[in-house]
């Protein structure tokens, strides 16, 4: 049996009179992919913020990586979650390589050779050339920056992305 990575049970969230989420229930199991598509303001980001513990539902329950988000140690939970920021998520003063290996380095992984190998593996995984590792974010297109953001999120080997 596969682990449930995301579970929302009858989740509702309002901002004033605007209901961003209305009785949403969903289950995403380990190994599954979910794409949430909708117009601006329809609740996509609100749902992600709830999964990451950045916002609480007005009603219902949210589970991520097997934990009740409302009861979880959020720092510990967030270490299991890779998050790609939509806009301007890269550090402009760091090379692509340093952006990718940022989380492993601050978590104690200091072996430069191993970090370079990880960066090379992940840059290839997102479809970019190794030569990009020595560039700075401003030298990349918006789409390339998004891919680097995905590589950085994967660098910590999260259970949930």
Regions found by a protein language model. Give the residues of each.
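The feature captures the beta-strand-to-loop junction immediately N-terminal to the Walker
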Residues: 37-39
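Helix-to-loop junction immediately C-terminal to a conserved catalytic motif
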Residues: 52
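Conserved ABC transporter NBD signature motif
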Residues: 60-68, 77
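Short helical segment in ABC ATPase nucleotide-binding domains corresponding to the A-loop/adjacent helical element
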Residues: 97-106, 116
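Conserved ABC ATPase "signature" region
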Residues: 113-131
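Conserved ABC ATPase signature
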Residues: 136-140, 144
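Conserved catalytic motifs of ABC-family nucleotide-binding domains
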Residues: 157
């Amino acid at each position: 049996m596969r682990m449930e990575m995301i579970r929302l049970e009858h989740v509702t969230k309002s901002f004033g009179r605007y209901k961003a989420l209305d009785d949403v229930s969903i289950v995403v199991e380990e190994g599954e992919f979910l794409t949430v598509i909708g117009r601006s303001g329809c609740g996509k980001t609100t749902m992600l913020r709830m999964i990451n513990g950045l916002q609480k539902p007005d009603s219902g329950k949210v589970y991520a990586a097997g934990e009740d988000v409302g009861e979880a140690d959020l720092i510990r939970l967030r270490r299991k979650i890779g998050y790609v920021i939509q806009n301007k998520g890269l550090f402009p003063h760091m090379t692509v390589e340093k952006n990718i290996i940022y989380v492993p380095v601050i978590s104690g992984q200091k072996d430069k050779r191993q970090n370079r190998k990880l960066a090379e593996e992940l840059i290839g995984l997102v479809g970019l050339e190794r030569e990009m590792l020595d560039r700075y974010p401003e030298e990349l297109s918006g789409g390339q920056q998004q891919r680097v953001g995905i590589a950085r999120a994967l660098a910590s080997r999260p259970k949930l992305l």
